[in-house]
Amino acid sequence: VRFDGLKMAVLVTSGLALGGDHIDQLIFKRFVSPHLGKGERWVRRVDGAVIETEFPFDEFEALLLNWPVTYTLNQGKYRSKIRDGIQQGGAAAEKFQRLEELISHNLSYRVFQAIRSAKAALSTTAETIIDVPELDLSIALGLPEFDDLLQDLLAQIETLIDQTLARAGLNQSDVDLVIRTGGSSLIASIRLCLEARFPGRVVVHDPFTSVAAGLSIASYYGHEYDPATTIER
């Protein structure tokens, strides 16, 4: 955005269709799913023969990640596979039992609450815990592991910044101010990415309400938007 007195020109708009929920799902898949049976062996008897394969966790994971529909995993075609996993015993049985309890008590949303709390904690500390006592689940999560999880996302952000500046006809040095907004802007690696590219020019103010508040302030002071200057994504 370029300001000239009370007039503002949006030079270019662009963005990634990835938000905090996407990051929460990445955390679930990498750090939580292995504690629910992902990657374990599945032993069952079919027509008198003992068959062993990898447990088909992919059938469960999509519904676990979309917590409003996790209850649909209560169907027999899913529960029977979990029962096989529990009955086979061994170290994996505890994980399958945990998966059974998550589904029976519809605890996916509770797991995501714990993930969001841990993610927020990593904005200010180097290590935290994904803690879900209802499932006897406590997973240590450190900043290095979290940063590694975000590498693809950070690369996309870097590319998007380059593309946005190019389309606006600007260099990094032409940018006077970068405003961090939204919960994901509090993530340490994203903050450091922006500060490395725009040193001394990155600010944050009320990341969860700044967009709505900014529009209200702009309206109060009579700022005018000229849509003719905008380059769409």
Please report, for each region that a protein language model flagged, where it lies by residue.
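Phosphate-binding glycine-rich/basic clefts of nucleotide- and phosphate-handling proteins
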Residues: 2-134, 227
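Alpha-helix capping and helix-loop boundary segments enriched in small/acidic/polar residues
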Residues: 14-19, 137, 181, 185, ...
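Conserved phosphate-binding/catalytic loops in two-lobed NTP-binding clefts
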Residues: 17-18, 173, 191-216, 225
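Amphipathic alpha-helical transducer elements in NTP-driven molecular machines
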Residues: 20-25, 93, 108-112, 143, ...
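A polyampholytic, Gly/Pro-enriched intrinsically disordered region
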Residues: 38, 220-233
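Adenine-nucleotide phosphate-binding core of ATP-dependent small-molecule kinases
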Residues: 100-108, 135-164, 168
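Glycine-rich phosphate-binding loops at beta-strand->alpha-helix junctions
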Residues: 103, 107-110, 173-194
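Phosphate/ATP-binding catalytic cores across multiple sugar-kinase/actin-like superfamilies
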Residues: 114, 118-121, 149-178, 193, ...
